[in-house]
């Protein structure tokens, strides 16, 4: 009888231990599952943030690519080329005889303070700058020397 009681006590203890370990195991599983869910949610949020940043970057890249695309650049270049062609067609290029144009001598001197340039128009004959010098009365005055200088 004692043996039966001990066996019964042992089986009850084993059953209670099994129940206790089972409940602890269930509790730990719930805790681990909850922790896993929290981590998965955080990973999902982080992935969404990364995707949104990547999508923003890809949108910006595609926008820049569109701006640099050949169609836009080509249209701008074609507009510019057309404007240049129209301008060149509207302007008639005339051949100038440079022998008739008076030359203005440019003098220069290099010093420790820099290089100085100046022009002297005293070499021009009287009334040479007039359109029709015969009809103007300037008494054939000699041009006043107008020296201009600049430091380079």
Curated annotation (Swiss-Prot):
One of its GO terms (molecular function) is ubiquitin protein ligase binding. InterPro entries: Malpha/m4/m2. It comes from the Eukaryota. Residues 23-61 form a coiled coil. Keywords: Coiled coil, Developmental protein, Differentiation, Neurogenesis, Notch signaling pathway. One of its GO terms (biological process) is sensory organ development. It holds the Pfam family ESM4. Changing residue 82 to K: In strain: NVIII-41. The keyword Coiled coil applies. Changing residue 11 to A: In strain: Nv2001_m0595 and NVIII-m11. Changing residue 63 to P: In strain: Nv2001_m0592. Part of the Notch signaling pathway. Belongs to the M4-like protein family. PANTHER family: BARBU-RELATED, ENHANCER OF SPLIT MALPHA PROTEIN. This is Enhancer of split m4 protein. It comes from Drosophila melanogaster. The gene is E(spl)m4-BFM.
């Amino acid at each position: 009888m004692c043996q039966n009681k001990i066996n019964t006590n042992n089986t009850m203890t084993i059953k209670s231990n099994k129940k206790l370990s089972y409940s602890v195991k269930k509790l730990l599983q719930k805790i681990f599952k909850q922790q896993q869910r929290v981590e998965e949610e955080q990973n999902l949020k982080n992935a969404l943030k990364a995707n949104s940043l990547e999508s923003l970057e890809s949108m910006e890249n595609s926008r820049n690519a569109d701006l640099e695309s050949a169609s836009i650049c080509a249209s701008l270049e074609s507009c510019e080329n057309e404007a240049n062609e129209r301008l060149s067609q509207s302007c008639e290029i005339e051949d100038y005889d440079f022998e008739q144009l008076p030359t203005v001598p440019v003098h220069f001197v290099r010093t420790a303070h820099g290089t100085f340039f100046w022009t002297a128009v005293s070499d021009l004959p009287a009334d040479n700058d007039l359109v029709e010098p015969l009809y103007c009365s300037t008494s054939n005055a000699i041009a006043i020397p107008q020296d201009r200088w600049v430091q380079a």
